[in-house]
């Protein structure tokens, strides 16, 4: 039993650490082809159609500058802390299940961008009734979409945080047994794989996230807050004339550019974390060492950002005021997102340095049984 478990684990590790297959290269190529297409459609529309038309919005030129603003908003929003936490933690979960999820960030950002694009399409098709509510922070539409989006985002991050807490406790227990020499390699692998407590509580949800594309609806739900949609809509609707005089292609190029920027960086983030975790899953000792560090960081990030979102939502709904609540409400999640990305990259780099110079694998790998 233990031998077959170890054989399955070695097969899984070999699968994750081998070179990309032709099918995986094909999927990566399709992802980046979509990203390139978004860039081409967005920028060619701006440069070849919008800019030569000399359109104006609120007395100001509507051209490359506005397109660059939309693109920059997409790049910036890719570093939102909730994006980083959701993508990186889901990558961990799928890799621990034996998958190689190359497109988690890609599908998450596509789902998020769909909300923005859908709003723009409604504007183009004449549903001007949503213009005022989307522009107005105190409107009922803005209120309830923000409530729904933030609640889903915070709850998802807490769910991911709980998942990682349970995983972390199990890994620490395995590590303690390893240091005492109580288990051989096969038993250690069995302990790492027997993390079924989470399934008892969150089985349906965790089982549903088995493919990278499952992050598309998650990204869509995250986008229901209309925070980013409002940024794009305000670009189009600013001024008293709103979007009344603009052609459809001028309006739709903005969410396309927004999606291009966000998809690019979210895809790079997901791919980077995929290969970083791939190194960690190649042997039992690496899994223990790396996962204690990174899972602890994942727990901290998910629970921190989830707490900020949910506490801010509760304080806003209940009208709580004071120095702490004012500080909490003023936190910039974009800045936090950049910090989170740096923390993940730095943790990976430090883990590799300590691994190399501390001879961790040599010191922690159980000695082979010499009686057989």
Swiss-Prot record:
Subcellular locations according to the entry: Cell membrane
Keyword annotations of the record: Antibiotic resistance, Cell membrane, Ion transport, Membrane, Nickel, Nickel transport, Transmembrane, Transmembrane helix, Transport
Catalytic activity: Ni(2+)(in) = Ni(2+)(out)
Protein topology in the membrane: Multi-pass membrane protein
Cellular component, GO, one term: plasma membrane
Regulation of this protein's activity per its record: Export of the fluoroquinolone antibiotic norfloxacin is inhibited by the proton ionophore carbonyl cyanide m-chlorophenylhydrazone (CCCP). Nickel may influence the extrusion of antibiotics possibly by facilitating the proton motive force-dependent efflux process.
Impact upon substituting residue 82 to I: 66% decrease of nickel uptake. Decreases or abolishes resistance against several antibiotics
Alphabetical list of InterPro entries matching this protein: Ni/Co_transpt, Ni/Co_transpt_high_affinity
Subcellular location, principal: membrane
Recorded consequence of changing residue 77 to I: 23% decrease of nickel uptake. Decreases or abolishes resistance against several antibiotics
GO terms under biological process: nickel cation import across plasma membrane; response to antibiotic
Transmembrane annotation, as ranges: 30-50, 55-75, 104-124, 152-172, 218-238, 245-265, 294-314, 335-355
Gene Ontology MF term list: high-affinity nickel cation transmembrane transporter activity
Short name of one Pfam family: NicO
Family to which the UniProt record says this protein belongs: Belongs to the NiCoT transporter (TC 2.A.52) family.
UniProt-listed PANTHER family: HIGH-AFFINITY NICKEL TRANSPORT PROTEIN NIC1
Function: Involved in nickel uptake. In addition, acts as a drug efflux pump and contributes to moderate tolerance towards different classes of antibiotics, including fluoroquinolones, aminoglycosides and the anti-TB drug isoniazid, with a preference for fluoroquinolones. The drug efflux function is probably dependent on proton motive force (pmf) or ion gradient, and might be facilitated by the presence of Ni(2+) ions.
Further details from the record: Overexpression of NicT in E.coli and M.smegmatis enhances tolerance towards several antibiotics (norfloxacin, sparfloxacin, ofloxacin, gentamicin, nalidixic acid and isoniazid).
Protein name (record): Nickel transporter NicT
Originating organism: Mycobacterium tuberculosis (strain ATCC 25618 / H37Rv)
Gene: nicT
